[in-house]
Amino acid sequence: MSAAAQKAKHYGFALATVYMCYFTYGIQALILSQNKVNFYTQWGITDPTQGSAAVSMAIAWMGFGKLVSVWIGGEFSDRIGRKKFAVAGAIAYIICFTLMLVVTDATMCYVAAFLSGAATSGFWDAALYPAAQEAEPKYAASGVIGIKAAVSVMGVIYPLFVAWFSAPEIWHVNIYLPIVLSVLCLIMTIITPFRYDDERATKAEGDSGMDEAQAEIQAAKDAMLKKPGVLVQVFTLLMAFICMFIMYGAQQYTKAFGMANLGLDEMGGAALASIYTVGSITAVFFWAVMMGKLRWNPLKVLLIDFAFSTLALALVLVVPNVAIVYVAIALLGFFAAGGALQTGLVVRQNYCPGPKGRNTGMYMTFMGVGATFLPFIVSAMTSAMGETGALYTMMGLLLAASVIGLLFCIYLANQSKKLFGYTINRKMD
């Protein structure tokens, strides 16, 4: 086998490990909302409104864990390397899922939720997003959007799995599953080589030249006609908040919206959540081809995502017909959850070149704000107006966020010619 082929195979396994970790994350993202009734019953709460508010608060603590950890994680991932952070994230996942299995009060579950958020963003996002981009730098956008594919596949499977094992005497199977997968992730992260770590080791052995990562950053800066302005810096970070705000709202509350606002049963709500995820999986492969093979500009993809997400959310709010909502939720999955968050990270790196761990940490910090803020206000609104009104109001907030994201994309598209000398319609190199 040629050296080039060996290198490709070597870091192909790194991508497989990244995707396995995010396949498991697909459960972490959904476990509280999908098992809502069984969780708050285990905590000793009998009132459904109070129970729903408590679960939303646990989800908020999960987001808070993301918020406080990811920026620091990104900085240390660049300094320490990808493997140590990936391994630490897997260990933390095993601990937090085990806590969720055994705790019998909401406060302790908030601790577990916080830990799971910190494990996801502070360790895995900080290490594995850069690792996906570094495995094959030319196809960084496709590598990163593949993360969304891994999450989305589990997003289809897990709600249906939960519906099958929702009975009180067997529902803990829904927690055993991520514990087993987390152990598998631990094994894979231990044995996986990562390009960034190998380059650091090579440099430490005496290579005094600029490493590939620094050379890539400098080349990107040199290719720009001028430095990005303050609004470009701010908008590319706020995009993370907006993408996460929309995606997290639909991901966490689609099932509850279907049951509370459309009158669906448990299986119908799970099916609605799965349709949302099917839309996202379809989009992942579609956009991977558009950006990987056809070399579409990631910002062009993001602009289209926001335009159609706005349309889908408007349909959900204006046409409360079950069939129409199913179609709209599928569209929302395709355009809002089909890699928009991951594509936004690539846009950030393109417009504001810098160390990938640092850029990932900054971007994911704003993502963490969205993941914290949304469930917190849903919890407060549920206590104030009941679940039905809270979820409808939340959909209105998602629509407003989508419109703002669309305006941000239009501004960045107008800046493309000034920064790069070409429009977003030109194929990427």
Regions found by a protein language model. Give the residues of each.
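Cytoplasmic helix-loop-helix junction between adjacent transmembrane helices
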Residues: A112-A149
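Helix-to-loop junctions at the C-terminal end of transmembrane segments
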Residues: S69-G81, S166, A283-N297, T382
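Extracytoplasmic
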Residues: F13-I45, A250-K255
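C-terminal transmembrane helical hairpin of 12-TM major facilitator-type secondary transporters
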Residues: N297-T343
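Helix-loop-helix hairpin linking two adjacent transmembrane segments in secondary transporters
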Residues: Y139, G143-D197
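Conserved MFS/SLC helix-loop-helix module at the cytosolic interface between two early adjacent transmembrane helices
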Residues: V68-T104
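Extracytoplasmic gate region of multi-pass secondary transporters
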Residues: L32-S33, G229-T277, I281
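A late C-terminal transmembrane helix in Major Facilitator Superfamily
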Residues: N350-M385
